[in-house]
């Protein structure tokens, strides 16, 4: 199996592994901000000396499951991959240099539910080795009087659920 195929398989397994679990159990929470009307995804992992971005998948959540709306993978460092620092964000729909766009971006529609899964490889002083980490965030696009804006959906620990009502 090629390095690229291994990379994709690892990403798919990590995302599938966390699809129905709480954000703090098997995945860490990703951040979402807004840039030019689109979501911009970030990870905050202060223990990592280096974060290597492997890929990002964004899905629409429906009653029937999930539908991919954007997917990008990045080459591993030995193949010239770019490094992601905790302060940067990945803007939805951008074609990044050296990245492979597996699924071109679909328009994000107000009132629909979305989830983002970001896979990174991190090096930390504690482990002295590379490990894979999955970051997850749920969001929606909400229309107000003047425009459409991004809303990150919080995880409610006591209720063991996502607070999707903020998107209504």
Description of each model-found segment:
Residues 65-67, 95, 135:
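Boundary-flanking segments of nucleic-acid-binding domains in nuclear regulatory proteins
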Residues 21-27, 47, 121-168:
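Extended, polar beta-sheet/loop recognition surfaces of beta-rich domains
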Residues 1-20:
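Sec-dependent bacterial lipoprotein signal peptides
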Residues 79-113, 121-124:
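Signal that preferentially marks extracellular ectodomain short beta-strand elements
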Residues 20-78:
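N-terminal export/targeting and maturation segments
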Residues 39-43, 82-86, 90, 150:
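Generic recognition of long tandem-repeat/solenoid scaffolds
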């Amino acid at each position: 199996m090629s390095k690229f195929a291994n990379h994709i398989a690892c990403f798919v397994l990590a995302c599938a592994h966390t699809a129905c679990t709480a954000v703090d159990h098997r995945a860490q929470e990703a951040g979402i901000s807004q840039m030019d009307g689109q979501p911009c995804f970030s990870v905050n992992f202060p223990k990592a000396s280096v974060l290597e971005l492997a890929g990002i998948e964004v899905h629409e959540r429906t009653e029937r499951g999930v539908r991919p709306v954007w997917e990008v993978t990045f080459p591993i460092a030995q193949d010239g991959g770019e490094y992601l620092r905790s302060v940067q964000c990945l803007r939805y729909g951008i074609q990044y240099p050296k990245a492979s766009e597996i699924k071109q971006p679909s328009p994000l529609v107000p009132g629909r539910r979305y989830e983002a899964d970001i896979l990174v490889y991190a090096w930390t002083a504690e482990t002295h080795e590379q490990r894979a980490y999955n970051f997850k965030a749920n969001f929606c696009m909400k229309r107000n009087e003047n425009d459409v804006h991004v809303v990150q959906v919080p995880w409610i620990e006591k209720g063991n659920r996502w607070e999707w009502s903020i998107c209504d």
